[in-house]
């Protein structure tokens, strides 16, 4: 689904979305902001590239790092829920992953990402995706 289609649905249903981004460094928010009328459905988001902001701003529990790691389905869900609650939006979206060139501490291969979705009064879920490319291509692909 293209970003314009997402925006059209949000506008039609009068719903709002916020983003919490680690590996994509604000690209999802940027893409949402390119849509005319974005201020009607997108109040903003948080770029939490390292752990400290995930905990202090998004409310991600400390123990989640020890048990699941910073790149995991559970982390993506916690980030999405945290930003949704922080911004009081209907939906929260998050990204966390391994962009490269090094594999990082997660043990996951480069190009592994989790995209989280938190729904007000609904179920929180995350999907794992794989992108093949260099660091920049991986960030854009995940976004």
What name fits each language-model region?
Residues 1-143:
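Short alpha-helical segments enriched in small residues
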